[in-house]
Amino acid sequence: MNNFQTILVSIFLAFFVFGVLVFSGVLNIGNKSNKSIATGKVLIWGTLPSSQVKELFETSLPGSNQSFTIKYVEEDPNTYEQNLIEAFAKDQGPDLFILSPDMILENNSFIFKVPYTSFSKKNFQSTFMDGADILMAKDGIFGYPLLDDPMVLYYNKNLLSNEGIVYPPKTWDELFSLSGQLVKKNKDGTINQAMIALGQYGNVNHAKDILSMLLLQSNNPIVKETDTGYALTLKDGTTSGGSYPFEQIVNFFLEFSSPSKDSYTWNRSLPNSFDMFTSGKLAFYIGYASELFKIESVNPNLSFDVTTIPQTKGMNISRTYGNIYTIVASKKSKNLTSALGVASMYTAPDFLKQLSINMSIPPTTRTLLSSKPEDPYLSSFFDSAIISHSWLDPSNSDTNSIFKDMIDNSISNKLSVGEAIDKASSQIDLILQKTNG
């Protein structure tokens, strides 16, 4: 979107917000004595740390005065969803709340969707990153995307340079070819230095998200909206051999933990992948942009860098997985009009830029993503955000268990890979049916 288009969209949003605030009574024009007009108090819940965002959320918008107050409350990620359910049941929930994609469908009944008459599909798509398209439902927009936390490839610079490897791999094929150089074994055959943590579930951080990323790289959306609700696409398409593309993906994932394969680099006896990387014994770690400072704090002496995730050779698309943090409005808000106005103002470039700086992860608008920061880490994060996608996971905890069983059953040969996928698909289908009502 060029500068002129950006200005037009900003003007449109400004007039929309102005109308919302006048209608709600936040901007009380021509009726100073009317005490029944909405107070403009807006309560926001989210898991973003208060130390980095509270002041910004509460004080950065025009009109933040005694008649218009915003309060941000940080919630524990482990209890956030349950707290939302209990609060809404008592009519004590927030007016606005911030969700990652794996919480949207579970909370769909609480969300007020922004109608396309207020913010058209075209304007939404021209304003926000491609991956935000999952927020566009048939009957409106779930909410406004604020930040994206993309998956990236962290790599140990010393381990690569020791083997004469100048650049990190750009494709999975290139990664395969490096296993002979980067995997080191003891005399008894145990792995002392690993190339990458793939092929297991229990000790691979973000295993479900990595599998999701591989699916997205194959251009499979995982879940899509239909006329009857949301449907699973795990088994969409067939290969020349008659199997699902997802079967090939799972087999690819498992090769890294198969001792009979040249790519063997990981097994269940090894430490957690994050711990292995920060101890200097893992060449590549697939993690989130938000893990950067944690890596630095655990091992300040670790010589590492970051780049985009390897892609599938021959595909005409580039994808990584990302957590898109979205601010949504509650159907039960007693101050819905004001809440919607506040949420839309949080899409202003100045606000999103500062929020991105505070959190050290990328914003979601095309205009801001096109202006990469000078910091090399953040520049890679912005590159990754541009290709970042996600899916509307109907139940994060349930699907995590289902994916774990799928991988564990395949490794133990309790089920073939195809059978394990069939079982997982059926289980997720049942969850989606409940979600669809």
List each model region and its residues.
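C-terminal capping/gating helix-and-loop segments adjacent to ligand/active sites or protein-protein/ligand interfaces
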Residues: T6, Y72-V73, M136, T320-Y321, ...
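Mature extracytoplasmic/periplasmic domains
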Residues: N34-S36, S51, S290-K294, Y325-D398, ...
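A structural signal for short loop-to-beta-strand junctions that line the ligand-binding cleft
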Residues: E86, P94-D95, S120-L160, N316-R319, ...
